Structure formats: C-alpha cells, structure tokens
C-alpha cells in the first residue's frame, strides 16, 4: 500500500510538471484549456437559461433605494493613502473619516480581469469555478428582487464572461472616449434624474488604474509630476509611480464624487467598491510589472475596498451598517462582495449566504481564503 501511494504521487507530480512546466507540453495544455473555456463562455446563454435565484427582499426602506456597486481596475491597496501609503493619493476619501468603511484585509480571487470580475459579479467561489457557467450574476439577482438594474462600463466589450453577465442587466451602456471614470457618474446622474420611481442598482465597471496609467485621468488631474509616458525600465520608476498614483488619486475624486451625489439624494443608498486585482510596480529586485502572472505577489493580491452608507440607510438598516464597520480588519476575498451587496439590499436567495457577507454580524472569519490560479484551480 505505501508503495502504491508513493507511485501514484510520483506519477501525479511528473504529470503536473510535464503539463504545466515543460515546453512544448505546457503550450499544448494551455491551448486546450483556453479552448474549453471559450466553449463554456459561448454556451453560457444555454447552460444558464433555466437558472433562478428565487430572490426576495426581507425588508424595504420607507423611501426608494439606490445601491452602487463599483468595480475598480488594477488598484492595489499599497498605493492608497487610506491603507497607510505615504503619498496623498486619497485626500477626499480620507476627509470623509468614519463615514466610509475601509476593508483593510481584502484579497482578490484572481489577478486577471477576465477571471476576477466575473467572480465579483457572481456567487461562485474559487473552488467551484465551473458553476460560473451555470449561474446568473448580480444583475439577475437584483432583477428578481424587484430592482431596475444598470450596468455602466468604462471598458470595451470583449465577448467574455463579463459581458455575458452584464447583459442580464435591464440596461447596459458602454462608455466612449475619453475613458475617464467620471463619465460613469455623469451617466448615472442622468438616469437617476429620469427615473424617480424605481429602486435602482448601478454596477459601475471602471477603467481605474489600467495601464497606461497616464491615460486614466485628464491632464488637469495630474498631481504627481513628472508623469511622462516612458519605457518600462527601473530608471523610469518614479515617473511610472507618479502616473500610477495620479490614477489612484483620480479614483479618489471619482468615488468621493459618487458618494457626495448619493448623499444629496432623498434616498436610502449605499456604495460598495473593490478593485478587481492589484499590480506589480517594479517593487523589488525581480522587477515585476503589471499583473496576470502565473505566480502572483502580495501587490497583485491585496486590493483596495470600501463601503459607504447614507444616513437614511443607517437609520433603516443599522445592523448592516454597523456589521460592515466591525469587519474593517476581517480577512476577506472578493467573493464576499456579491454576498455583501445582496445583504446590504436585504435580499435573500439561493446561493446568498449571510456568513459570507461583510455586512452581516454572522460573517465567518475562519473560512480559508483561496485564489484561482492560471489553470482555474483554487489554491
């Protein structure tokens, strides 16, 4: 028996090395893996056709409800002033003080947008990745619960799972050039002013801090200088960091403006934000840059995330607002985001679990945090 176990282990190890690490076997394996994923995405409309959350709202406010779910891009926590960074990248959010809840221990489930965002829009955990192609996403959940749903994207359609899930919203709008995130707020304002009756969910998919960083903000928003477009070399590190930090500072302006607008409305409202993944920025001797590498880093995993609740929300649903504040330092992954926004809206449904919501007193801090690797396995 021990010899059988040893042989099986050695065989599996050899198979893993051949498949994942030896050229050209790994190339062939990855081509097959990508082809299989492509087929699953293409078949999504069919495989998810009969899916229902059986959602219902357990409580409603005494005025209309507006919830904003903001998905950031490539925004690592290490460069946010709110997380202890020594540059003023969050002056406006910092000025809000205790009005915002900063989730300080949030890790992404994937360091690539095309994997991370679908999971942020879904109830699926990393260890059940194939369920992504059977279940509907957040727009469908809120539709069932009686909300009018809007998906506003500052990124181009790619024909991938993000677009499949986004199309379940009642309305889907892709922004045009220039792709500055403030246009998401401008569009949201027009919608809110035109629709004064419905409870609303807005999903705002930002361009955030996507490379090239200097293109993510208008020139008048350039605070850290010089921020020239330069070759990715260590000698230009400060200019690269200046541009990246300017993009974070522009996100600060954008989020604080969304919060300010929500606060001005006669509505029960809340905002939940998280970046999809972080970024490497030539941080150490490895000189790693960007994200999506097969072996990840703390800078790619640790993302910025926060919540805000209106005074009306805190009056009507004090338990959820207080629970979120109590979990500022709780260990979490972006899996909690779907669960948290559903809980904030007081939605009960299949695949909605209070113990996975940061806005629930019963949030479970003991759950092992997993990451989806480049072979779609939870590690």
Residue ranges and their predicted role:
Residues 68-69, 250-290, 338-345:
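Metal-dependent active-site segment of extracytoplasmic phospho-/sulfohydrolases and closely related
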Residues 220-237, 288, 312-321:
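Flexible internal linker/loop segments at domain or repeat junctions
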Residues 84-88, 267-268, 272-318, 354, ...:
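Histidine-centered active-site microenvironments of extracellular/periplasmic hydrolases
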Residues 7-69, 74-231, 302, 333-335, ...:
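Active-site-proximal alpha/beta segments of enzymes that process anionic O-linked groups
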Residues 279-284, 346-379:
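C-terminal cap/loop subdomain of S1 sulfatases and analogous C-terminal strand-loop tails that border
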Residues 129-134, 238-249, 293-302, 314-341, ...:
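A short beta-strand-to-alpha-helix junction
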Residues 52-53, 186-189, 228-271, 301, ...:
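A long, amphipathic alpha-helix that forms part
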Residues 1-6:
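Short, small-residue-biased leader/transition segments that mark boundaries at the very start
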């Amino acid at each position: 028996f021990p010899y059988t176990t040893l042989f099986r282990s050695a065989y599996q190890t050899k198979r893993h090395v051949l498949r994942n690490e030896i050229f050209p076997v790994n190339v062939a394996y990855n081509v097959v893996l990508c082809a299989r994923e492509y087929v699953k995405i293409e078949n999504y409309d069919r495989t998810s056709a009969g899916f229902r959350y059986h959602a219902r709202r357990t409580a409603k406010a005494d005025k209309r409800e507006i919830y904003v779910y903001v998905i950031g891009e490539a925004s690592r926590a290490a460069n946010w002033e709110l997380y202890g960074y020594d540059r003023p990248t969050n002056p406006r959010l910092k000025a809000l003080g205790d009005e915002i809840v900063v989730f300080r221990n949030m890790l992404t489930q994937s360091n690539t947008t095309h994997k991370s965002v679908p999971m942020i829009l879904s109830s699926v955990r990393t260890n059940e990745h194939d369920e992504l192609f059977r279940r509907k996403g957040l727009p469908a959940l809120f539709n069932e619960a009686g909300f009018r749903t809007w998906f506003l994207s500052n990124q181009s359609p790619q024909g991938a799972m993000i677009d499949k899930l986004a199309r379940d919203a009642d309305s889907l709008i892709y922004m045009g050039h220039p792709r500055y995130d403030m246009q998401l707020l401008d569009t949201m304002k027009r919608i809110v002013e035109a629709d004064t009756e419905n409870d609303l969910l807005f999903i705002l998919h930002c361009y955030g801090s996507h490379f090239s960083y200097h293109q993510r903000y208008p020139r008048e928003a350039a605070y850290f200088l010089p921020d020239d477009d330069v070759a990715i070399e260590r000698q230009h590190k400060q200019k690269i960091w200046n541009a990246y930090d300017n993009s974070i500072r522009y996100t600060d302006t954008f989020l604080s403006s969304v919060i300010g607008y929500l606060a001005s409305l006669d509505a029960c409202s809340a905002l939940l934000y998280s970046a999809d993944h972080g970024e490497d920025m030539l941080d150490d001797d490895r000189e790693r840059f960007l994200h999506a590498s097969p072996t990840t880093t703390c800078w790619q995993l640790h993302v910025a995330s926060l919540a805000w609740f209106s005074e009306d929300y805190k009056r009507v649903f004090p338990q959820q607002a207080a629970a979120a504040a109590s979990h500022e330092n709780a260990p979490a992954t972006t899996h909690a985001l779907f669960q948290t926004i559903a809980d904030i809206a007081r939605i009960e449904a299949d695949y909605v679990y209070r113990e996975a919501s940061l806005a629930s007193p019963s949030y479970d801090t003991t759950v092992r945090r997993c990451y989806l690797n480049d072979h779609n396995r939870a590690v």
